[in-house]
Amino acid sequence: MSVAKENGKAWAEAEGDVLKAIEGTEQAISAPSLMMGESLMDASKGYDTVSYRQPLGVFAGIIPFNFPAMIPMGWMTPICIACGNTIVLKAATFTPQTCMRIAELYKEAGLPDGVINIVTCSRHEAEIFLSHPDVKGITFVGSTSVGKHIYATAASNGKRVQALCEAKNHALVLEDTPIERTAAGIINASFGCAGERCMALPVAVVQESIADELVNAIVEKAKALKVGPAYDKTSGMGPVINAKHKESVINWINKGIEEGAQLVL
């Protein structure tokens, strides 16, 4: 309910966000076996070698608004903890409650205080993560411009950095495609999570011989998609995250029309 309430995702998508967080935790259970070191007898005359894998310390996770459960509690936190580290999460500005609620569940499950820590702050205040000597690494998901800044700044301070940034996905549709199934897939990829995800599909390149047929099928399915609030479980798509983002979407649509695009829906 927390994901749907603060993010606006349709109910099924919100459930999927949480389930993916659980899957990430299950996968992290196998991490300790990957942490085993290696030994080599008689590497050279009179010498044996032994290697150990040890925790680095404190990591910082900078979370996006679009997957407030899956990314911090499925991708970032479980592996970090399983490898013996602790983490400080910068909660997403627009969706902080879900992250906090899952941290409460970790505590209820017996996780010691101080292993997961959550802060709410602006992006400018979060700059301290990039230079603080106690932070050994950064994991980030978000925009490309911010990701490049985080990568360059944190790396220059000797930190390990993961930065998953924006994507520009394309679909290539050939004339032997099953039209209905392809149209359904494009609808799901384009409108899922109101398009607010890195797996969203903004471009489809279609073989000319089937272009009109596919467009008609997509329009028909899009018209049937119910837009509504997340608490209505029959809603197929919820709102975008805020008014500013809505304006951005409208501006891109208008720009496309100005440049010759035909609006079919």
What are these regions (language model features)?
Residues 31-38, 108, 188, 192, ...:
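Conserved helix-loop functional segments at active or binding sites
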Residues 4-5, 16, 131, 152, ...:
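Phosphate-coordinating loops and pocket residues in cytosolic domains that bind phosphorylated ligands
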Residues 37-181:
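Rossmann-like NAD(P) dinucleotide-binding subdomain of oxidoreductase/dehydrogenase enzymes
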Residues 6, 10-13, 17, 91-94, ...:
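Catalytic cores of large soluble enzymes that bind and process phosphate-bearing ligands
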Residues 145-265:
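ALDH superfamily catalytic-core signature
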Residues 1-47, 241:
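N-terminal Rossmann-like NAD(P)+-binding subdomain of aldehyde/semialdehyde dehydrogenases
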